[in-house]
Regions:
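Conserved acetyl-CoA-binding loop-helix of GNAT-fold acetyltransferases
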Residues: 83-99, 120, 124
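Conserved beta-hairpin
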Residues: 45-60
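Conserved catalytic-core motifs of GNAT/GCN5-like acyltransferases
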Residues: 110, 128-144
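A conserved beta-turn-beta hairpin within the catalytic core of GNAT-like acetyltransferases
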Residues: 64-74, 104-105, 143
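A short beta-loop-alpha structural element at the N-terminal edge
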Residues: 2-26
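Active-site rim helix/loop that mediates acceptor-substrate recognition in acyltransferases
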Residues: 30-47
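Conserved beta-strand-loop-alpha-helix junction that forms the acyl-donor binding cleft
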Residues: 104-123, 136-137
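Conserved acetyl-CoA binding element of GNAT-fold acetyltransferases
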Residues: 68-87
Length: 158
């Protein structure tokens, strides 16, 4: 007897972040990404991991740069695309909690200059492109676009 599609579908879950979660994603889906830099970022503030079954599919967090300012980061696997709406809702709730708990007035995020999918997602999340390209920004000298989300903006999540 064949199983129905809904009976076999596994919904994502959120768990507290563990450094090993990001390591699994990087080893599996992003071998070109600098694991040391990612681990330092991931261990420097509140973070969560999205899981489907026994596999992490994404990690996200906020590094507290200085009082009132956070730097948002995210590392995702290719599997995350199937859960985009869920991820957006969970991440918005996470950012609201972090903003409230830490008294933030500004969030920043960077995305690779050639990654239009993630640029569009940051826009959906309410971040606004600051304009221009920051060349040589990452440890491996890749260029990024900087995005901001500032208290008082119409997209501020509070």
């Amino acid at each position: 007897m064949a199983r129905s599609r809904s009976a076999t579908k596994i919904s994502p879950q959120v768990r507290p972040f563990q450094v090993a979660d990001a390591r699994q994603i990087l080893n599996r889906d992003a071998p070109e990404q600098d694991p040391v830099f990612t681990m330092q970022q991931a261990d420097a503030g509140p973070a969560f991991t999205a899981w489907v079954g026994d596999r992490p599919i994404g990690c996200a967090g906020v590094v507290m740069a200085w009082p009132g300012v956070g730097m948002a980061w995210m590392t995702v696997s290719q599997e995350i695309a199937a859960h985009g709406l869920w991820l957006t809702r969970i991440t918005r709730a996470f950012l609201r909690d972090i903003i409230r708990a830490n008294g933030l007035h500004r969030l920043e995020a960077v995305v690779l200059d050639d990654n239009t999918r993630n640029q569009q997602w940051l826009s959906v999340m309410g971040f606004v492109w600051e304009g221009g390209v920051a060349h040589g920004y990452l440890p491996d000298k890749r260029a990024v676009r900087r995005y901001e989300l500032v208290e008082g903006m119409s997209t501020w999540p509070m």
